[in-house]
Amino acid sequence: MAESEKEAALPPKEEFSEWYNELLWMAEIMDVRYPVKGLYVWYPFGFAIRRNTYNIIREILDNSGHQEALFPLLIPENEFMKEAEHIKGFEDEVYWVTHGGRDTLDIPLALRPTSETAIYPMYKMWVRSHADFPIKIYQIVNTFRYETKHTRPLIRLREITSFKEAHTVHATWEDAEAQVKEAIGLYTEIYRRLGVPVLRSRRPDWDKFPGADYTDALDAIMPDGRTLQIGTAHHLGDNFAKTFDIKYETPDGEQRYAYQTCYGISERSIAATISIHGDDKGLVLPPEIAPVQVVIIPIIFKKGAEEVLAACKDVKERLTKAGIRVEIDASDLRPGAKYYKWEMKGVPLRLEIGPRDLQNNVAVAVRRDTGEKEQISLPEIEAGVSSKFEAIHENLYQKAKVELENRIFECTELEEVKNKIQDGVATIPWCGKRECGRAMEDVIGAGILGIPLEQKRDRKEKCPICGEETETRVYVARTY
């Protein structure tokens, strides 16, 4: 980018759509100019955010008994079409490969929209005995969906570049149920590491994953009040096992169908993180995923310039040895331009070191999240920086948590819901009947997210459609 472009004004965050689109470009996360709708290019800086985010995901999954594997992108049509209910949910979104060179293929090949039909034929061959369970395998791959709605980088794409999908196999329905609960817990932990509070709910039957017994999901509330689905976990029952003939032998020698789950998370995790934490100056990144965690700005005058630069290099070397990602900006840009650049990129901590700081044996630390300035003793720079990182992360999470809680509105009337969902998420009593839920959605003009997983059922209220008493409330929201 030209220097004039780098210092162009970012729209205020209250104009969220414009802010988001400009931020992706100005902070060098994604370039949207690729000549195919819904396909985008990761800049190196954005890809580093992705890599650091997915390092967290891999760590948490690996530490909970999951194993990473890799399955093919292409799925034969005859395998893809086996699960009728599942396919109904995806058939309008599938990309098909029909030719190899100039030859028409005997069997068309689907570009995976999701991988159940690629993985489960292999599970049929792998699963033999109850001793094999649980099988907990995941992969991180690109998937393709022919989106006809308005596409948006990281949020609604035709190529999902970073789809983490886990597929597990179990002996009983109850074991699979426990796995869904574990998955939701793992996802909550991932988002805690990203400083993102979540809503957790069970989707209504008409919005569950095609072919599943039920779906639990995580949503974030975005700055414009809409919710973004950022994780799902599906109990598949034995539905896919029957379709793909996945059986195991019990201790008594009996052959039974297995029970399965699958759960996914994508680059929407990054969309939520940058949207919730960012501000009018640009990105505000949690230290753990920031490509540059500390930027050192030498404050140089003619006298003492060499000593200042030497001190900056020493600090960088020490912090790097401590596992911290550091850059020194010794460019010819004026200090204000340097601050602008690194604030836009969301660097969590800026260290300023000048001649007077050297005399006092300190660096001036400036936090990106609050703008607070504080001196850190140079002999204790490693511990001082690490302490700042912990404080920054906790502040980002607590601030976002308060914002989320302030955007959840308890309602009893549908007209009230219509008003409140302009700013966030409403809750409303629901009897649980499909016809009442659908009627509510029609009146409100928005969807039921689901029943909160941690809901307290301590009072009876009336369903606004049929008047039946219920202890259940549901989340209602505008969604992406």
Swiss-Prot record:
Homodimer. The keyword Cytoplasm applies. It catalyses: tRNA(Pro) + L-proline + ATP = L-prolyl-tRNA(Pro) + AMP + diphosphate. It comes from the Archaea. Consists of three domains: the N-terminal catalytic domain, the anticodon-binding domain and the C-terminal extension. This is Proline--tRNA ligase. CDD domains: ProRS_anticodon_zinc (cd00862), ProRS_core_arch_euk (cd00778). Keywords: Aminoacyl-tRNA synthetase, ATP-binding, Cytoplasm, Ligase, Nucleotide-binding, Protein biosynthesis. It comes from Methanosarcina barkeri (strain Fusaro / DSM 804). Transmembrane segments: none annotated. Catalyzes the attachment of proline to tRNA(Pro) in a two-step reaction: proline is first activated by ATP to form Pro-AMP and then transferred to the acceptor end of tRNA(Pro). One of its GO terms (cellular component) is aminoacyl-tRNA synthetase multienzyme complex. GO terms for molecular function: ATP binding; proline-tRNA ligase activity.
